[in-house]
């Protein structure tokens, strides 16, 4: 009789160890949508990715809008001349109502003489 209870105790302890190694099943009453068995819910993951990417998209859109505004400004200010993207981005930051001459460091010179001798 004592042997039987000892075997039952060993079997019970083995079941307990085995149950510890198995993943716990999700409680049906739990409302944690973030993870099941340590795996993130795909809808929650998509939200995380969207939140991480959103500032990048907004920054890219702002930069693109700034370049377009600068190109428009260059075209009006310099009689239809076009600007490269970097110049357009710089011009977009100027005050559009200020028609005074801007400091030379804001202009991009492509003239070899100016670049060689460094007048500015």
Swiss-Prot record:
Q: What is its EC number?
A: 3.4.-.-
Give the free-text PTM comment from the record. The proteolytic cleavage of the internal scaffolding protein B releases the scaffold protein in order to continue virion assembly.
Q: Which UniProt keywords apply?
A: Autocatalytic cleavage, Host cytoplasm, Hydrolase, Protease, Viral capsid assembly, Viral release from host cell
Q: Does the keyword Ribonucleoprotein apply?
A: no
Gene3D superfamilies, sorted = Scaffolding protein gpD of bacteriophage procapsid
Give positions of region: Disordered.
1-64
Q: Tell me which family the UniProt entry assigns to this protein.
A: Belongs to the microviridae B protein family.
Subunit and interaction comment: Component of the procapsid complex composed of 60 copies of the internally located B, 240 copies of the external scaffolding protein D, 60 copies of each of the viral structural proteins F and G proteins, and 12 copies of H.
Its recorded name reads Internal scaffolding protein B
Q: Which organism is it from?
A: Enterobacteria phage phiX174 (Isolate Sanger)
Q: What lineage does the source organism belong to? A: Viruses, Monodnaviria, Sangervirae, Phixviricota, Malgrandaviricetes
Gene, per the UniProt record: B
